[in-house]
Amino acid sequence: MDFSSVQAAKGHFGKSIYKFGFNSAISTTEETVWDEGGTYAYPTAAAVLSVVSSNAADAAAGTGARKVTIEGLDSDYKVQTVEITLNGTNAVASTETFIRVYRAFVSEAGSGGTNTGAISISTSSTVRAEISAGMGQTLMAVYTVPADYTGYIVGWSIGSGATAANKYLDGRLIVRDPDGILLTKARTTISNTTVIQPFGKAI
């Protein structure tokens, strides 16, 4: 067991983050591992969030999700968390602006216990996060290190599953450096399996 990772999870070395995601339908072009599918578009400026569900049951007095908590960064890249009360298929605007959204989860629900519909979180009509129906939280392998923090990646894993034979997934771990350059830090090709790769040296 890596006891340093346990200590990090306890908060003894600052804060640990476990990021994971899922993409249900990847084709022959590169996509980001996240609920919405396609390539993730990072905002270039902080903006108000628009939060809406595809189902009317996700509302303040509904049987589905009633409130969602959104985690991300403000215009200064500082950590910011807000809770939004849903209004079904009617969009609700946040009072705060975000330049990054990297997680959202159902924080209050009715008798259904979680969200009934898909909950989209957007800025300027572009989806920045989505909670797929029944999932209760985002599944997005996307993260930005906040201002005044230093991030270290200690490993990654990737898996694929396909019903057809001879289907392969070419996956890579991408990091944006402080100068804005995108760097591939790990890459592997798999077919109907999962690869778990701890790094001997954190990156």
Where on the chain are the PLM-derived regions?
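Beta-strand-centric surfaces of beta-sandwich/beta-rich domains
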Residues: 1-100, 107-203
